[in-house]
Curated annotation (Swiss-Prot):
<dbReference type="GO" id="GO:0006543">
    <property type="term" value="P:glutamine catabolic process"/>
</dbReference>
<comment type="similarity">
    <text>Belongs to the glutaminase family.</text>
</comment>
<feature type="binding site">
    <location>
        <position position="160"/>
    </location>
    <ligand>
        <name>substrate</name>
    </ligand>
</feature>
<dbReference type="GO" id="GO:0004359">
    <property type="term" value="F:glutaminase activity"/>
</dbReference>
<feature type="binding site">
    <location>
        <position position="261"/>
    </location>
    <ligand>
        <name>substrate</name>
    </ligand>
</feature>
<keyword id="KW-0378">Hydrolase</keyword>
<feature type="binding site">
    <location>
        <position position="191"/>
    </location>
    <ligand>
        <name>substrate</name>
    </ligand>
</feature>
<dbReference type="InterPro" id="IPR015868">
    <property type="entry name" value="Glutaminase"/>
</dbReference>
<feature type="binding site">
    <location>
        <position position="64"/>
    </location>
    <ligand>
        <name>substrate</name>
    </ligand>
</feature>
<dbReference type="Pfam" id="PF04960">
    <property type="entry name" value="Glutaminase"/>
</dbReference>
<feature type="binding site">
    <location>
        <position position="114"/>
    </location>
    <ligand>
        <name>substrate</name>
    </ligand>
</feature>
<comment type="subunit">
    <text>Homotetramer.</text>
</comment>
<dbReference type="GO" id="GO:0006537">
    <property type="term" value="P:glutamate biosynthetic process"/>
</dbReference>
<dbReference type="InterPro" id="IPR012338">
    <property type="entry name" value="Beta-lactam/transpept-like"/>
</dbReference>
<protein>
    <recommendedName>
        <fullName>Glutaminase</fullName>
        <ecNumber>3.5.1.2</ecNumber>
    </recommendedName>
</protein>
<feature type="binding site">
    <location>
        <position position="243"/>
    </location>
    <ligand>
        <name>substrate</name>
    </ligand>
</feature>
<feature type="binding site">
    <location>
        <position position="167"/>
    </location>
    <ligand>
        <name>substrate</name>
    </ligand>
</feature>
Amino acid sequence: MADLKAILDSIYTDILPRVGEGKVADYIPELAKVDPRQFGMAIVTVDGKVYRVGDADIAFSIQSISKVFMLTLALGKVGEGLWKRVGREPSGSAFNSIVQLEHESGIPRNPFINAGAIAVTDVVMAGHAPREAIGELLRFVRYLADDESITIDDKVARSETQTGYRNVALANFMRAYRNLDHPVDHVLGVYFHQCALSMSCEQLARAGLFLAARGSNPMTGHSVVSPKRARRINALMLTCGHYDGSGDFAYHVGLPGKSGVGGGIFAVAPGIASIAVWSPGLNKVGNSQLGAVALEMLAARTGWSVFGD
């Protein structure tokens, strides 16, 4: 394997002069307070080695990256039946598009846009009170990362609850089309809390390692999903994981990944490693500007792109 420490150090050196680029997600008041002049990156390999640079131990709001973990839970509960509620195609529209949802009769295009993630959350809630569903997700992520210190930032959750008007509209559209089984306020309460998960790059890379290792976490010995399901979650991340910037990310980076407006990106090099990068400044489609640049550098310097070196 390439000398990952040297490669990661070289990426950090090249990124450092640009730290602060992009614009923080100011439409969520708590995220607007985050200092954009931060950058961290962590790599966890399938043989258990951990590499990190910069602010890799600072917890940040993972936001939409949480959708990967919620999707994993939902597939565990209902399997392929999930795809009656949500599609598997790239959206080509903004992550919070209302027009597309109405045009497609309340069936969200994929589980990683906001409407799709809200539908997935509704599935996970079956038989649970909202507080129980939030607890289930938190326990699951702690189990994946083998880290009981992971928390949900209640200030961020409240901030989203107070300003998430488009998400309220999306949920009401789906409820009108009978694609939500639970009351809108209950589903959104869970959704806003899942997006407020607070994790560091290292914690996030550890939690997602099962997707790099055929569904099992080699560091903990935990079997999480089947190899087939891991492969399919990775496929969805590659095609849909970066909103309407997914094609561009595949073109430049060539790895399955999921971004969040907190500035994080989680990525997978199948059979090799899981990667998490964080830089709060976003590009025009809501993905971490320097996070994407750093991952492009990583793919180029390691040859890890799924499309070849």
